[in-house]
Amino acid sequence: MATAGPGGSGGGRAVAGAPKRWWRLVVITHSHRRYPTYVDLGRVGVWWSGSWRSAAEPTVDVAAELESLGYGALWSSGGFDPGLSPTFGRLLAATTRVAVASGIVSMWTGAPSEVGPAVAQLESRFPGRFLLGIGASHAPLVSDYARPYSHMVAYLDALDALDTPVPMGRRVLAALGPRMLELAAQRAAGAHPYFVPVQHTARARSVLGPGPLLAPEVAVVVESDPEAARALAREYARLYLELPNYTENLRRFGFGDEDIAGGGSDRLIDAVVPWGDVATVADRIREHHDAGADHVCLQVVSGPGRDGFPLAEYTELAGALMAG
């Protein structure tokens, strides 16, 4: 049984006329114990798969500075380890209030028996600040990839059966298609789609309904020159356009073989990877909010030869996004 506060997720219902808030409050009853859980993500977060170290000061994380800029969450890749990466604890320790989320832990390698206790440990040290993102990964990356939906159901069952379960409100699914989106609404706080156009955000909201969290990742290029911006975007997109889960999802929105080949057509790149000056990129992020996203995970794609974290771009974008 799950009940939700205003704008909450799970089986609860938002209070009529209540203002929408950018957090989720869920209470799970499991084995006669109650787990009050919430994660405040804010409207915009940072998604990053590389080093969180400052280019200017290589021994210093940028997490505290991102928190001071107003970003509500820091999303980091979960990798393919059996447990949770130590990066999550390090980011939490370096900050005071910002949420930290995995985007994502692979259900094929992140064993529930390892992940669950690690989440509980983070909760004991940093109450209410860690969100577990779980995903099905991709057939080319997993040696024994079969029946991903059924495997995800079994994975969630295993998390629920732990001595210290991972509550529904503390987990999100990397959902793209309708079945996984429905599962995200029924068994998690919501969905964390990756590499999607704004049309997917609108459709995901219609599948999830008004309550569950919708937090898409959106990669951006802060570059006004079309040729240079699209070249950077294609370099980023090339890997994802070789993975069937992403290409099948893009086909749902009218993109064909000619769009997917060669690192992506201009039409596809422009739809999936917003580019332009800071104001233009900020407007494209707001389109996802207007389409139903509660929270957007912003991933800056920077040019070749750039070492360290692209803090300058995130600083500029924060000025535009936090202002409105």
Regions found by a protein language model. Give the residues of each.
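Compositionally biased, low-complexity flexible segments
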Residues: 1-19
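Compositionally biased, low-complexity segments enriched in small residues
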Residues: 16, 24-25
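Active-site-adjacent structural elements that line small-molecule/cofactor binding pockets in enzymes
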Residues: 8, 21, 27-324
